Amino acid sequence: MDKVYEPHAIEQRWYQHWEASGFFAPVGEGAPYCIMIPPPNVTGSLHMGHAFQDTVMDVLIRYHRMKGDRTLWQAGTDHAGIATQMVVERQLAGVGQTRHDLGREAFIERVWQWKETSGGTITRQLRRMGASLDWSRERFTLDEGLSRAVREVFVRLYEEGLIYRGKRLVNWDPVLHTAVSDLEVISEEEQGHLWHMRYPLADGSGHLVVATTRPETMLGDTAVAVHPEDERYRHLIGHSVRLPLTGREIPVIGDTYVDPEFGSGCVKITPAHDFNDYAIGVRHALPMISIFDQGAAILPRADIPAKYHGLDRYEARDLVVHDLNELGLIEKIEEHRLMVPRGDRTGVVVEPFLTDQWFVKAGPLAGPAIKAVEEGRIRFVPENWSNTYYQWMYNIQDWCISRQIWWGHRIPAWYDGEGRVYVGRSEEEVRAKHGLDASIPLRQDEDVLDTWFSSALWPFSTLGWPERKPELDTFYPTSVLVTGFDIIFFWVARMIMMGLKFMGDVPFREVYIHGLVRDAEGQKMSKSKGNVLDPIDLIDGISLEDLVAKRTQGLMQPQMAARIEKRTRQDFPEGIPSYGTDALRFTFASLASTGRDIRFDLKRVEGCRNFCNKLWNAARYVLMNTEGQDCGSGGGACSYSLPDRWIRSRFQAAVGTVTEAMGQYRFDLAAQALYEFVWNEYCDWYLELAKVVLQSGNEAERRGTRQTLAGVLESLLRLAHPFMPFITEEIWTRVAPLTGAFAPTIMRQSYPEADPALADPEAEREMAWVMEVILGVRRIRAEMNLAPARPLPVLLSHGTGQDRVWSARSGPLLEKLARLESLNWLAPGQAEPEAAIALVGELRVLIPMRGLIDKEAELTRLDKEIQRLDKELPRLEGKLGDASFLSKAPPAVVEKEKARLADLQAGLASLVAQKERIQAL
């Protein structure tokens, strides 16, 4: 093995070997275990959320593969309709063209070309993460098999009356000119205004005051609503007001939706441009007056004054407010904070828009999906997310599935010259079914399906449905879905509905919901904040200048660049070092506590990189002491020392902890157990203890220790493999032959199982005693500032009979690891000398101080340290007592200062105690 651990030297080589050898494919006769990857956008690149989620899935897949399950991790990508189309449209815009200049067929061909040349970025990056997906089965949501499934589902749902075309209110992006899903709308609080407007009563007896954040929409008002129990207005219900600027009379209606306490208690109702107003409009059969075209400009309607025709909505707002003010109909204008919905792709304000769209009737599909979770056929982890699921499902609305773009699954519906609609799997089927010969022209619907429609079929369409292929029977239902909370409704619920409808069973047994990956301060990562980390940069490293350039390019708000550059230079003065994939994966696992958002700190990755180094160096030590030597496989007698029996026993405990944690999706606890065993027990203790046996034991003991060194290392590599696949494979291929294991890959080895026969409570008790004595001596050495290499005389007193047995048996271990000059028991009744003392139960461990330290020099040194801390403490206490600091500083900074104060206080107390001990000598 190389002297230094270099992850890049091994990662790419091993991944290519695994993939070329077909090791990711399902094998064996074990129980099926299947995970469907949430298909990433084919045009996208890996972000921290992907990297975290894919690590969790790969840990599960590798774990179950080694458990002997017939394991499939289904690979695939999503066509990502709007996102992909926008990329290609931007390319066309760069040469002064639009998609309409090319025409539909040529544009779609252009998108396919771009997908083939540029669409493999994210799958290459998944490989860099070590993701053991079965690439031989990779699917794409627009490939022919999945497209056939989409058409089949659409036709069946339409024939059952569960898909229909109708005019309803949708989220409309006026730049893209298409409906968008709620998930593609980002609502953030912004500063705006609240306009209070007077609507005159039609009988001239006065006016009502309504408040709105969107005065331009008053051109489409069709009512004023009041609460039916509001004494101020109850007598006006059924009367009319005259809508300013238009002259239309609109009714005053009573509806319990109105909050009498908000504003004047009167609400303008614009059913065609507000979702709440739409519901009121439906309840009261109000007219739906659309005032905007697809680009959010005022329509040239006869009931809207011509001066507003063609104006952009914000130009119309200014003119409407001006005209109302001129008429004395503005009561007041207030500053107001409001939630503004913007398209996540374009950044423009999304408009509630009344338009003809295709819808799925969701109610009949939701009932069985709710029941499946209630009956426990699907379990959410953590359980509390089932409440979110129920909340959405009980309030489900019909699903708008049509999009006014070109890239996607075209809706399988055709129209004749009279506007009659025919739905079928193909135009040929439609003509045959309805007796329409070639002389009757048919026009296919221009719209495509919402990307989530094909994604909802992912668990069974990827396995060959509607054909009944063997893999469909084997792997459906899948085992677990790993996903974020933000798409429980958009994807999870819809997969459940479609799976139950078309497969007659749930699509997965469990849903593991993970949190968001945030930065070290708990802030959401976003390009505008300049705090985005690229997982590939953490693997490969990136220079400061390249990182600054990366973070400041392509900003929607270029003025943020200077601030982002300043922060980046402050946070990463040396850029980001290369950590390697295994360190990043182990970091993600150690942070994967169920249901919580993840605070991602590079210090954690650095710690995990150090963990990889520790494992690498431990393996080098083991190989240097075992390769070419007798490790017990030749039949020679083996005698197992106390450290051998102890580490074997501790390994059984570690296996039990990791296995239990994996069953509970507590990857953080599994990673913690691995870390503690490898670092604290195997490396820090056992390897040091083994040196003593190898140097002084008899041949049978040395043989037993060599066997244990190699055997435990081989087993812990298998235990750690799902988390750290590359380094474990590299080391395992060298170590495995020493244990008699010969195989092409660790991936196909069995996962360790705890062996009760190797549990040795007696060895653990004795080793705990040995470790306490050693630590006690080391603690005194540190407190008294005694050189680590200086051998110390140790006396023991007041111990039990068991202490005497253990000290006699483990004397060589104590002398070597505690660096003792001598180890003796005081005779019964013999007075204890002036000494520093460590207590181990009843046992007193004494280090006589006479002649070991310069008492006066040590007291002088301690006084200086105490004085330094005495000056530092009041300054820090004052800072934490400053209300201004506490209110303005980020919570993470405050907590850091509190922790520093606690450390200083503990350090001062320790120094004072040490001074008192030395003064007493």
From Swiss-Prot:
Q: What InterPro entries has UniProt attached to this entry?
A: aa-tRNA-synth_I_CS (IPR001412), aa-tRNA-synth_Ia (IPR002300), Anticodon_Ia_Val (IPR033705), M/V/L/I-tRNA-synth_anticd-bd (IPR013155), Rossmann-like_a/b/a_fold (IPR014729), tRNA-bd_arm (IPR010978), tRNAsynth_Ia_anticodon-bd (IPR009080), Val-tRNA_synth_C_sf (IPR037118)
- Positions of short motif 'KMSKS' region: 524-528
Reactions catalysed according to its record: tRNA(Val) + L-valine + ATP = L-valyl-tRNA(Val) + AMP + diphosphate
* GO CC annotations, alphabetized: cytosol
Which UniProt keywords are given for this protein, alphabetically ordered? Aminoacyl-tRNA synthetase, ATP-binding, Coiled coil, Cytoplasm, Ligase, Nucleotide-binding, Protein biosynthesis
A single GO molecular-function term is: aminoacyl-tRNA deacylase activity
Return the similarity comment.
Belongs to the class-I aminoacyl-tRNA synthetase family. ValS type 1 subfamily.
Please provide the record's free-text comment about the domains of this protein. ValRS has two distinct active sites: one for aminoacylation and one for editing. The misactivated threonine is translocated from the active site to the editing site. The C-terminal coiled-coil domain is crucial for aminoacylation activity.
Alphabetical list of PANTHER family matching this protein: VALINE--TRNA LIGASE, CHLOROPLASTIC_MITOCHONDRIAL 2, VALYL-TRNA SYNTHETASES
Could you give the subunit structure recorded for this chain?
Monomer.
Query: Could you identify this protein by its name?
Result: Valine--tRNA ligase
Q: Which species is this record about?
A: Methylococcus capsulatus (strain ATCC 33009 / NCIMB 11132 / Bath)
Q: Which gene encodes it?
A: valS
